[in-house]
Structures are given as structure tokens and as C-alpha cells.
From Swiss-Prot:
<dbReference type="GO" id="GO:0003697">
    <property type="term" value="F:single-stranded DNA binding"/>
</dbReference>
<dbReference type="GO" id="GO:0005524">
    <property type="term" value="F:ATP binding"/>
</dbReference>
<keyword id="KW-0067">ATP-binding</keyword>
<keyword id="KW-0963">Cytoplasm</keyword>
<keyword id="KW-0238">DNA-binding</keyword>
<feature type="binding site">
    <location>
        <begin position="72"/>
        <end position="79"/>
    </location>
    <ligand>
        <name>ATP</name>
    </ligand>
</feature>
<dbReference type="Pfam" id="PF21096">
    <property type="entry name" value="RecA_C"/>
</dbReference>
<protein>
    <recommendedName>
        <fullName>Protein RecA</fullName>
    </recommendedName>
</protein>
<keyword id="KW-0227">DNA damage</keyword>
<comment type="similarity">
    <text>Belongs to the RecA family.</text>
</comment>
<dbReference type="GO" id="GO:0005829">
    <property type="term" value="C:cytosol"/>
</dbReference>
<keyword id="KW-0742">SOS response</keyword>
<keyword id="KW-0547">Nucleotide-binding</keyword>
<dbReference type="GO" id="GO:0016887">
    <property type="term" value="F:ATP hydrolysis activity"/>
</dbReference>
<dbReference type="InterPro" id="IPR027417">
    <property type="entry name" value="P-loop_NTPase"/>
</dbReference>
<dbReference type="InterPro" id="IPR020584">
    <property type="entry name" value="DNA_recomb/repair_RecA_CS"/>
</dbReference>
<dbReference type="GO" id="GO:0003684">
    <property type="term" value="F:damaged DNA binding"/>
</dbReference>
Length: 355
């Protein structure tokens, strides 16, 4: 028996080396290693198409090799956000797939958001099992960067489709997802792709205290996701009497790669998607790139206009100024590790119950 600490440490190291050697013989080289042999200096990400949301995520976008969930009420912008992620991935030369379980993808709208629909791989599966098998094949190919499943609620188990309309099928979808995610999690990590689940909200019956909202598909998806985004419409944007878009808020209710409970606000314009000009104005004022006095906005002692919509019109016609402001905003965020100061609304999230 070793008589001093150094000899004991040496014996432990020999035992560990022997164990590692046996594991590699049994499971192959690379099955186990010390972290310094495979260091990760920076998380690889894909932009969401929103400057504010990229900042709120803390790493500059959605992390690759992870499972993401985007959930919210109807017509809140879930699919729009997912399509923007696809467009950003394609700009980097990535391949993307869209599993249209709802059979409701608007191809013309996707093109307006910048998605190259000619290069987009699309599937409209008949059952939930078929959808998850297709996803597994795509992930294991290692050739796809982003896969979007729209939506979890539409992943109908085969037994439910083949049964009668009034039959009760308790927990079938939850078991389907639980089994599928157990297989997909490691495959997604090895393939270094992003798997996005779009999910809907349901109401719990009989809840008096606390949040009655929940998402479909059971609890498995909540555990396996690295990032969960709660997207909501908080207002409308009007041009005189016509409604031209929605004011949108996204809360990062779960984040395994950066501090959670941050939020981002941006505009989603009809037939246009996320308004980059609106974000430039809001983020510019927040970070001090733009000067705001009352309703007036200024940049480098030049008045841009009165009111947010007038400033958006100015920046739309003066693209060089808009690009210059955007560059300064991104530089500031990069110098602060893509994180902005959490505002009062975000601080309140720490005290809310997240389902």
C-alpha cells in the first residue's frame, strides 16, 4: 500500500489509465478522453435573424449540436422565427430541412423571408413515427445543419391515425417523443446540427394558482432541449388604419449555454418577417449608438426623425447609415460577449414560474 500522497496519486493515475485503455478497447478510440484533448473554445452558432434575440441568447445565436424548442400561442411568429434561422444557415452555405407535419408551409412567404426554397429539403410525413425516422436519417447523414419540425402537436402517433375518431389514446404522443429524443440527442450532438421543435400551448384544467399554460408532448422535450424560447405577440404595428405587423417579445426560459431569463423585443412585419430596421433603432438607443430625446432620434448629431416609424422610413432610404449603425451595434455586443444588460422585464422572469 502506498505510504505517501504522491505514491497514492500515482497509483490512482495508473488505475485510471488502465480503465481508459479498457474502455477504448471495448468501445473504440474516442469513446472516452480528457477534455484538454478536445477543447471547445467557442460555441458554434447560427443567427436567429434578430440582433436582439442573438444577444439575449448570450452566444450570438442558436448553438449547434443542440435541440431547441420554440413555443407560443397561435400566430405569434413561431414558424417565422424558425424560417429566419433556416435563411441565416443557408447564407452560410448550410443545408436545411423542414418537416412539415402540419402540411401548412407557405412557400411564397418563406421566400420573402430569405429562404432559398429550391435548396430546402421538405417532408410532409403521415405519422409521428415517420417524421422522427426521417429526422433520424437526416441527422445521422451529417449533411444537414438545421432541421425544423413544425409542429410537435401535429406529430400524431400511428395508432391514433389508424384508430376510430372517438378512441382515447392517453400518453401515446409523449411516449413517442420520449423514445425519439433519447435516440436523437446524441446523434444531433455528433452531427453538430440544430434540431428545432415548434410547439403549441395548451391550458391545464383546474389550475387556480400559478401558470395554467403548458406545452404539448409531455415533459421529455423540456428536459432534452438546450434552449427554450417563449414567443408572444405583445402589440400591433399600424400604418394609419392598416395593421402592418406585430410587436413581438421572446423570452429565453431555458438556456444551457448562457444565463437564461433574458428577453428580446422586435417587430415582425407582414410579408417581410423580422424588421431589422426596428431592431437597429431599439438596440441603437439602448446601447447609446443613437441619441434619443423625447420622440426624436439622432445619430452623429444628425436628426433621423420623430417617432420610431419615421426613423425606420429614413433608414430604409439611407441604407449606408443603417448599415453603419448595425455594424457599431454588433461590435458593441461582440465586445460584451453578445450579452446586454437585462432590463426590468427580464429581471421579473426570475421570479416567475417557468413551465
Amino acid at each position: 500500500m502506498a505510504s505517501n500522497p504522491e505514491e497514492r496519486n500515482s497509483d490512482k493515475q495508473k488505475a485510471l489509465d488502465n480503465a481508459i485503455s479498457q474502455i477504448e478497447k471495448a468501445f473504440g478510440k474516442g469513446a472516452i478522453m480528457k477534455l484538454k484533448q478536445n477543447p471547445v473554445e467557442k460555441i458554434d452558432t447560427i443567427s436567429t435573424g434578430s440582433i436582439a434575440l442573438d444577444s439575449a441568447l448570450g452566444v450570438g445565436g442558436l448553438p449547434k449540436g443542440r435541440i431547441i424548442e420554440i413555443f407560443g400561442p397561435e400566430s405569434s411568429g413561431k414558424t417565422t422565427l424558425a424560417l429566419h434561422v433556416i435563411a441565416e444557415a443557408q447564407k452560410k452555405g448550410g443545408s436545411c430541412a423542414f418537416i412539415d407535419a402540419e402540411h401548412a408551409l407557405d412557400v411564397l412567404y418563406a421566400r420573402k423571408l430569405g429562404v432559398s426554397t429550391d435548396d430546402l429539403v421538405i417532408s410532409q410525413p403521415d405519422t409521428g413515427e415517420q417524421a422522427l425516422h426521417i429526422v433520424e436519417y437526416l441527422v445521422c447523414s451529417g449533411a444537414v445543419d438545421v432541421i425544423v419540425i413544425d409542429s410537435v402537436a401535429a406529430l400524431t402517433p400511428r395508432a391514433e391515425i389508424e384508430g376510430d375518431m372517438g378512441d382515447q389514446h392517453m400518453g401515446l404522443q409523449a411516449r413517442l417523443l420520449s423514445h425519439g429524443l433519447r435516440k436523437l440527442t446524441s446523434a444531433v450532438s455528433k452531427a453538430n446540427c440544430i434540431l428545432i421543435f415548434i410547439n403549441q400551448i395548451r391550458m391545464k384544467i383546474g389550475v387556480v394558482y400559478g401558470n395554467p399554460e403548458t406545452t404539448t408532448g409531455g415533459n421529455a422535450l423540456k428536459f432534452y432541449t438546450s434552449v427554450r424560447l417563449d414567443i408572444r405577440k405583445i402589440g400591433v404595428i399600424k400604418d394609419k388604419e392598416n395593421i402592418t405587423g406585430n410587436e413581438t417579445r421572446v423570452k429565453v426560459v431555458k438556456n444551457k449555454v448562457a444565463p437564461p431569463f433574458r428577453e428580446a423585443k422586435f417587430d415582425i412585419m407582414y410579408n417581410e418577417g423580422i424588421s431589422k430596421l426596428g431592431e437597429i433603432i431599439d438596440m441603437g438607443a439602448k446601447l447609446g449608438v443613437l441619441e434619443k430625446a423625447g420622440a426624436y432620434y439622432s445619430y452623429n448629431n444628425t436628426r433621423l426623425g420623430q417617432g420610431r416609424e419615421n426613423v425606420k422610413t429614413y433608414l430604409k432610404t439611407n441604407k449606408e447609415v443603417a448599415n453603419e449603425i448595425e455594424t457599431k451595434i454588433r461590435d458593441l455586443l461582440r465586445n460584451h460577449d453578445n450579452s446586454i444588460i437585462i432590463d426590468e422585464d427580464s429581471e421579473q422572469l426570475l421570479e416567475e414560474s417557468v413551465f
